Amino acid sequence: PRVLEHMVDTVLYFESDLGSRFRIIRTAKNRFGAANELGFFVMSEQGFAEVKNPSSIFLSRRTESVPGSVTLVTQESSRPLLVEVQALVDANPGESPRRLAQGLDRQRLALLLAVLHRHSGISLVGNDVFVNVVGGLRVAETASDLAVCLAAVSSYQERSMPGDLVVFGEVGLTGEVRPVPFGEERLAEAAKHGFKHRAA
C-alpha cells in the first residue's frame, strides 16, 4: 500500500465523525509545501465549502460559563485553533472509578489527575472523571494538560472559569506549568475571538 504513496506528489486524508457535516483534510505528504497541514470544510448541498474560521466549529455557543468547561488554544500544524475542553467529575461510591477521555489520551488524563492529587491536594479518587474535546477533534499535544486540569477542578468544585479565559500549557510531574511552542500565535488567535485573559 505504501508503494502508491511514493509515486504521488501529495497524500491527503479526509477525516470526520459519523453524522458530522464537517470534514478535515490532513496532508500526510506534500512535495510542494508543508506536510501535516489541515484544511476544514463543510459539506453542503453545493458540495464542499471551506470553513474560514475553524475555531467557531469547536467553541460553545453558550452565553454564560458553566463548571467543567475551559477554552484551549491548541496548535494543529501551523494553525492555532480554539477548542472547548469539557470535564465531568461525578461521585462514584463503587471501588473502581472510571477515567474516560474523548479526543485526548486516556493515559495522560490519569497522569494529570495524579499530579493534581499530589501537588494541589485535590483528590478525585472516589469520582468518575470524563473529559471530552468538543467537536470531535483529537488533541495530541501536551499543551492541553492545563486545560484538562482546570476543567476537572472546575467541575469538581462546581465553579465556572471566566468566559474570556483561554488556557494552554504542559503540566510537569512536579506540578509546574511549562511553556509550549507557538505561544504568540496562540494568543493572537485567542485575541481575534475576543478572549482577554490567559492561563499558560
Enumerate the predicted regions with their spans.
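Peripheral, non-AAA+ core regions of ATP-driven protein-machinery
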Residues: P1-A200
